[in-house]
């Protein structure tokens, strides 16, 4: 007999809502317990501000877009009881909010690097170095902790202005008051996933630990949807709300790549690669960090600045689908390409001065399809280097890769990724972080992997083409050589089979 669900429904009849706060928009998906998507919605985010190292968005627009996306997802099921709702957000994005979870300033985005231009006093930097040693990884300028220090130095944190991570902020808007955070979102605010907030270290860098939120396990119930939020979103009032996660972890959940050796590669605006290990992976360079697995163990990975946003930057007015048709029959390009917009890379290597480049035969051409082709190859080589980096740190990086994110819809690009990686790449039927948040909303405590296996279906499997292996291995060597020439990675020996 099915277990009772919310409001007297049966578990098998309940629907689960996932909300994904992305860089360019908000997405929502309504999912059944068997993984069937019953409704989807999305809304763009248009009021962002980029100015050098500054990158801000309007948290009010996050809430407006959340309402629009959720109303669209629920359109065919008005008033249907929901099992629970869960929200994911971009890792490292921070906002100040009041006692009713309303914003009192702009959202400082995950890649806002103003801390580079406004270094902390020497005593604070020394305390940050001590904190980094305690955490076992550096505290880079884009971490939420650095943003928090910047806000504190400006006197903007106080009783009526407490920090919240992006996903927690929208979760709080749903509940009607601030909510606890989870270990994945708190990591870049300096939270120690093994021992909690390092209060003594935070005191020494000048932050009051009392201003920081409580931390609960990912997926823990944190409240119910308030009447005002119900009117705004269409979610029935009283629907359970659970602590969310980062967009990268949500995408990993959507892939069901939660067993050691399996990896989830989310290629969208940026590239995020995550896997599962029984022991925590430590990277002294800070390119790789590990989240707590809600089931136990660890979820190591990293997030690059490289990603598909380079297409719109380098090829304005051109649609990737049109360029794909023209690019699919082109030969492996000569030279090397790094697909980066802006300055600075954080994974699979840390190089604050890194910029995109395109070198060798065919570089600098004006044909959009050839330019798209070279950028696509660059993305695949970044992904291969990322897996190599994880393997050198001791992670089991030999297994299947599951591709999620918007780029997974491009079959040519996904096949290219399988060919460059020289391993099978799976594409789930539903590849977005919103789906992963819906899985998290449904998962009982300690059963996230089992819930994901039950809900996630494979739509395609791409096998690597052995006829292309030698040419692509040579291309990867050129790629590594170009990075080493710039001092971004150490010189490498001949790459073997991944």
Listing of model-derived features with the role each one plays in the protein:
Residues 108, 140, 218, 243, ...:
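Glycine- and other small-residue-rich loops at beta-strand/loop junctions that grip anionic moieties
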Residues 1-106, 133, 159, 230-231, ...:
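N-terminal glycine/serine-rich phosphate-binding loop of ATP-dependent small-molecule kinases
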Residues 80, 210, 396:
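Structured loop/turn residues at beta-strand edges in well-structured enzyme cores
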Residues 54-56, 128-138, 211-212:
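Short glycine/proline- and acidic residue-enriched helix-loop micro-motifs
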Residues 75-110, 136-142, 167, 171-191, ...:
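Short beta-strand-loop/turn "lid" adjacent to the catalytic site in phosphate-handling enzymes
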Residues 17-18, 116, 123-135, 145-165, ...:
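Active-site core segments that coordinate phosphate-bearing ligands/cofactors
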Residues 35, 58, 85, 112, ...:
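Residue-level signal for inorganic ion chemistry
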């Amino acid at each position: 007999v099915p277990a009772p669900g919310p409001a007297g429904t049966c578990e098998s009849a309940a629907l689960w809502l996932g909300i994904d706060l992305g860089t360019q928009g908000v997405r929502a998906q309504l999912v059944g317990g068997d993984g069937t998507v019953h409704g989807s919605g999305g809304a763009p985010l248009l009021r962002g501000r980029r100015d050098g190292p500054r990158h801000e968005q309007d948290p009010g627009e996050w809430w407006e877009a959340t309402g629009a996306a959720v109303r669209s997802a629920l359109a065919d099921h008005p008033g249907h009881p929901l099992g629970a709702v869960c929200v994911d957000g971009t890792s490292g994005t921070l906002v100040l909010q009041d006692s009713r979870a309303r914003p009192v300033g702009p959202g400082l985005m995950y890649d806002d690097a103003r801390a580079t231009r406004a270094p902390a006093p020497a005593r604070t930097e020394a305390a940050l170095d001590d904190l980094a040693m305690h955490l076992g990884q550096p505290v880079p300028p884009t971490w939420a902790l650095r943003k928090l220090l910047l806000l504190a130095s400006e006197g903007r944190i106080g009783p009526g202005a407490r920090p919240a991570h992006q996903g927690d902020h929208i979760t709080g808007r749903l509940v009607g008051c601030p909510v606890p955070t989870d270990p994945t979102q708190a990591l870049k605010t300096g939270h120690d996933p093994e021992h909690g907030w390092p209060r003594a270290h935070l005191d020494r860098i000048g932050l009051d630990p009392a201003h920081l939120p409580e931390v609960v396990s990912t997926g823990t119930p944190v409240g119910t949807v308030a009447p005002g939020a119900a009117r705004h979103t269409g979610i029935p009032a009283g629907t359970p709300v659970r602590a969310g996660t980062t967009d990268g972890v949500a995408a990993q959940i959507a892939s069901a790549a939660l067993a050691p050796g399996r990896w989830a590669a989310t290629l969208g605006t940026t590239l995020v690669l995550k896997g599962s290990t029984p022991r925590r992976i430590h990277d002294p360079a800070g390119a790789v960090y590990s989240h707590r697995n809600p089931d136990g163990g660890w979820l190591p990975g990293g997030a690059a600045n490289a990603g598909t946003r380079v297409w719109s930057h380098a090829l304005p007015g051109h649609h990737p689908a049109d360029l794909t048709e023209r690019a699919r029959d082109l030969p492996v390009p000569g030279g090397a390409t790094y697909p980066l917009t802006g300055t600075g890379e954080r994974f699979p290597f840390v190089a604050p001065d890194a910029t995109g480049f395109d070198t060798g035969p065919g570089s600098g051409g004006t044909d959009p399809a050839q330019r798209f082709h070279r950028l696509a190859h660059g993305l695949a080589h970044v992904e291969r280097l990322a897996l190599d980096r994880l393997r050198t740190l001791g992670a089991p990086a030999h297994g299947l890769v599951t591709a999620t994110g918007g780029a997974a819809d491009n079959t040519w690009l996904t096949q290219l990724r399988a060919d460059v990686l020289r391993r099978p790449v799976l594409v789930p039927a539903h590849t977005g972080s919103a789906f992963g948040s819906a899985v998290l909303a449904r998962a009982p405590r300690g059963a996230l992997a089992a819930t994901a296996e039950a809900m996630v279906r494979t739509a395609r499997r791409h096998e690597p083409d052995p006829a292309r292996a030698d040419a692509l291995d040579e291309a990867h060597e050129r790629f590594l050589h170009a990075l080493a020439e710039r001092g971004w990675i150490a010189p490498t020996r001949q790459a073997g089979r991944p």
